[in-house]
Amino acid sequence: MSVSLAPKLNHRGEHILSPESFNSGLMAFLDASPSPFHAVAAMRQALQLQGFDDLDPTATWSIGGGTNALITRNHSSLIAFRVGTAPLADTGIRIIGAHTDSPCLRIKPSPDVRRSGVHQLGVEVYGGVLLAPWFDRDLSIAGRVTCTDAQGRRLSLLIDFERPIVTIPSLAIHLNRDVHKNRTLNSQQEVVPILGDLANETETGFHRMLLDQVHHQHPESDVQAVIDYELSCYDTQCAQRVGIHGDYLASARLDNLLSCYAGLRSLLDAETEQSVLLVCNDHEEVGSASAAGAQGPFLHTVLERLCGDTETLARALARSLLISADNAHALHPNYDNKHDPQHQPRLNGGPVIKFNANQRYATNSETAATFRELCTRAGVPVQSIAMRSDMACGSTIGPITSTVLGVNTVDVGAPQLGMHSIRETTGWKDPVLLYQALLQLFESEKL
C-alpha cells in the first residue's frame, strides 16, 4: 500500500497538518499492516516512492552527502536514513526508534487440531497479550510464507486472507457461572481458534489452505509447495474514529505502528540538512534478542557502514540523540488508582516522556529537557509518566539501543488505553502531536 502523504505547508511555508489529514494516512497504514512483514513492506514502498534507494547488505555501499536510502532485515525490521552534507563526526545523527511487532496469536508449525466435529488451529501467544479481548472476534490470518516454485527455488511471500476465517468463541455463562470471579485463561486449552466444520472440510489441512491462498494472491510465482510460515491472527475490524465528538482513535496495533508511522512521516517530510535516521525493529514485545531486534547488530552495523570507521562512528554517536518512540499508558477513568497521582497522562494531551529510576527507560534529565524544548518549538504539549512505586513498568528499545550504542536517548510515546489488547485507543490529536515533536528533532538546527 502507499502511505498517504498529505500537504503539510501553510501559506507562510510552515508545517501544518490537521489530525484528520494525518490520521487518514495512519489508519490506512494500520489497516494494511496486519503483521510486521506487511508494515515493513508498506514503509519500504512509501520510501521508494519518495526516491529512497534499497541497499543490498551483501554489496559495497557508496554513501555520501544527499544519500537517501533504506535497508531491511528479515523483512520485519527497517532502517531508513538521509545523509546531510556536513561530516557525521561533526553533526551526529538524529535518530527515531520504534518497533514493528505487536502482541498477538501466532499459528503453530503443525497447527491442525480436529476435535468435537470442528477444525481448529493451534496458536502460540506472542508477547504480553491481553487474551480475553481475543474472544468472539472476527479474525483473519496474515504474515509470511516460504515456498518453493516449479524450478525448486525457494521464495518468501506475504499473504493476507483479509476476510474473517477463524474465531474463538467464549464459553456461555450458563456453563461457567464463576466466569467473573478471578478468571484465568489456559492458552493451550481455551485459546484455540475455530477454522471450520469438519463435515465441510475438503482440504487436507492448513498447509493446503495456505497454498491455495498463495496461488490466489501470487499467481505469477508458480508456487508448488508451502514449506514454512510466520503467520498471525488479527482482528478484521478496521481502524475507526470513535467518541461522540470523535475524540479518539481505536485500532489494532497502535502499539507500536503509530510510532512507526509518525517516524516515517517525519523522515519523509523533514526539510533539513541534518543527517537523520529511522529504525523500526522487530521482536520488541518478546525482548528484542534477535538479528532483527534492538539487541541485535542491525543498527550498529548500518551506522558503522555510514560512518566508515570506528573513530568517525564514536564521534558521531557522541553528538547524536535517539528518541525511542513507544506508546505510553494514559490514565484510565475506571482505574485511576493504577497511576501515580502526580503522573497521569491524558488522551489528547500530547506525547509522554517516560521516566524510571531503575533504567527501564533510557530517559535522563538532559535528554528529557531536550525533548521538552523540541515540543516547545513545535507548539506541542508534553506530559510525563513514572509508575507507582509499588508497580513494575515495562520497557522499550530505548535502554537496549542506548546500551548497545552508548547514544543519548529519551523514551517517549503517544498516550493510549488498552495497551496489548486486540484493540487499543489513543487520542485523536495524539498521533499528529507526536509527529510534530519528532519532526522538530529532524528539522532543528541545534538540539
Question: Where would I find each of the regions flagged by the language model?
Answer:
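N-terminal hydrophobic/helix-forming segments and targeting peptides
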Residues: 1-447
